[in-house]
């Protein structure tokens, strides 16, 4: 691989039409230090960072040209706290321009330096995409995923109650060792933390990822057609997986869209009247 600091930054290639009508995708780093087995980034052996001064200079040029919506595609934006804080400080100094910023964040890494900064941003000007993937520690261990759930809870509480950050959390259905009951528990636990969106994704077999090492022990069966989605596992039957596909569809339509807030209130009230008081199982049965 070439030295990342020798790569010419490409942001001058954005046209004025791009800047006026599209998201501006940017990156300050490439690679990921984590080894989550379902993710293509697990194949990258290192994290490389662009020259920060040059990067910030390019961001200034984009702002001067009228860019207002920035989506960072760094796999782990808050990996380096000094870099993360410098970039946040830069955009905070221009926040009066009505900027919107999107970052992918590690859920259990939110030290005071970052907390103090994001509290200063206006409501809705930042979105954090936070990968949880599973709430079950054993399942997380199966796929080499690390989450400090105590810190995750603390950080979500902070984001929901002390900042205006919009939070988008991810869960994956079909991970090796996770049944529907375990997923339901994790979904309900996550929902109680108050993220603005929960994306329920279905596991996909990405070429070259080590998730395939579990195929035999957990009887993982994937579709032979793109996007190579999981069809069943030892713990989730084909019928259950189809129900989870419907669950994900209706959850996205009703909850994540934000278009059915009154309906969501009614569903929440209905869930509280059940013995389990589970929002997951209430929507699961409604989507059958």
Locations of the language-model features?
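Short acidic (Asp/Glu) and glycine-rich catalytic loops that position anionic groups and cofactors
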Residues: 35-38, 64-69, 220-228, 259-263, ...
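A structural motif corresponding to the C-terminal lobe/cap of the Radical SAM core domain
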Residues: 81, 93-109, 113-277
């Amino acid at each position: 691989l070439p030295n990342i600091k020798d790569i010419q930054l490409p942001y001058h290639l954005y046209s004025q039409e791009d800047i006026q009508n599209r998201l501006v995708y940017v990156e300050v780093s490439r690679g990921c230090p984590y080894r989550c087995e379902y993710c293509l980034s697990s194949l990258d052996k290192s994290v490389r960072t662009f020259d920060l001064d040059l990067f910030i200079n390019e961001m200034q040029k984009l702002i001067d040209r009228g860019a207002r919506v920035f989506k960072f595609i760094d796999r782990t934006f808050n990996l380096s706290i000094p870099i993360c804080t410098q970039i946040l400080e830069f955009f905070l100094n221009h926040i009066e321009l009505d900027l919107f910023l999107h970052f992918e964040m590690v859920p259990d890494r939110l030290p005071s330096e970052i907390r103090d900064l994001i509290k200063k941003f206006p409501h809705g000007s930042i979105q954090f995409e936070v990968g949880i993937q599973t709430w079950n520690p054993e399942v997380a261990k199966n796929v080499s995923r690390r989450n400090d759930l105590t810190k995750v809870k603390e950080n979500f509480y902070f984001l929901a109650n002390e900042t205006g950050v919009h939070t988008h959390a991810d869960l994956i259905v079909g991970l090796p060792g996770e049944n529907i009951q375990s997923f339901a528990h994790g979904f309900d636990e996550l929902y109680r933390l108050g993220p603005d969106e929960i994306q329920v994704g279905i596991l996909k077999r990405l070429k070259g990822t080590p998730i395939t090492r579990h195929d035999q022990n957990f009887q993982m069966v994937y579709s032979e057609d793109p996007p190579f989605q999981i069809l069943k596992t030892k713990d989730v039957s084909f019928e259950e997986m189809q129900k989870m596909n419907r669950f994900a569809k209706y959850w996205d339509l009703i909850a994540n869209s934000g278009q059915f807030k009154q309906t969501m209130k009614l569903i929440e009230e209905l869930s509280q009247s059940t013995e389990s008081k589970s929002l997951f199982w209430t929507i699961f049965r409604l989507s059958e």
